[in-house]
């Protein structure tokens, strides 16, 4: 028999934070410090801090630092030279347009989106991002032990023909919801 106790109860994750989206992003430099710099460069701090009267609540499909770094290192000119070595090198309007394509004009939790029709690129919820980009956001159930639709539920986004996976959904703040995009996502305009 085993005498060692290798189980460590780390508790339940708390998806609710008593702060603004802007303040929340500052609590996790590992994932969000580059995102913060892009928001500042785009002049969108008030939007993320809940101080924009035209849009007091938001949903943010958040590109993490890794997503932004991939964009910077993979965006090259005709001579294969990296175009953006620092966030300050990215044009302000590009930062603004890319960020706004990740923002919805209201709070939406995972449960607020419809399911995708399995095996199709249809179903889900169609909604316009603040950039004007039409998004299809959908829930999908995976299989478990060979049985369809009883496994983990995920959240995904389609914009035109590109599809992206949400890494962590339903992080709620006072003025918004953050759905953190997976580390495989490369920051772009959706």
Positions of predicted regions on the chain:
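Intrinsically disordered, low-complexity linkers and terminal regions
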Residues: 3-11, 34, 76-77, 93, ...
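Post-signal-peptide N-terminal segment of Sec-exported extracytoplasmic proteins
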Residues: 20-57, 62
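Structured segments of extracytoplasmic/periplasmic soluble domains
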Residues: 24, 28, 38-45, 71-75, ...
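FKBP-type peptidyl-prolyl cis-trans isomerase
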Residues: 35, 61-68, 170-189
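Short, surface-exposed loop/turn segments at secondary-structure junctions
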Residues: 48-51, 78-86
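Short active-site loop/helix that positions an aromatic residue
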Residues: 66-81
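Aromatic/histidine-rich interaction motifs
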Residues: 81-166
């Amino acid at each position: 028999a085993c005498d060692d106790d290798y189980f460590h109860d780390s508790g339940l994750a708390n998806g609710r934070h008593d702060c603004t989206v802007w303040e929340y992003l500052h609590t996790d430099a590992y994932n969000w410090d580059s995102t913060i710099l892009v928001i500042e460069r785009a002049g969108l701090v008030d939007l993320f801090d809940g101080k924009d009267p035209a849009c007091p609540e938001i949903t943010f499909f958040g590109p993490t630092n890794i997503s932004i770094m991939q964009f910077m290192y993979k965006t090259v000119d005709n001579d294969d030279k990296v175009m953006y070595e620092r966030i300050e090198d990215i044009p302000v309007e590009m930062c603004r347009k890319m960020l706004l394509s990740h923002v919805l004009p209201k709070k939406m939790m995972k449960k607020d989106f419809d399911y995708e029709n399995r095996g199709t690129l249809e179903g889900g919820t169609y909604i316009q991002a603040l950039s004007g980009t039409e998004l299809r956001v959908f829930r999908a159930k995976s299989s478990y032990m060979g049985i369809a639709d009883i496994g983990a539920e995920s959240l995904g986004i389609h914009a035109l023909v590109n599809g992206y996976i949400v890494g962590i959904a339903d992080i709620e703040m006072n003025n918004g919801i953050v759905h953190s995009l997976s580390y495989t996502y490369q920051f772009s305009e959706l």
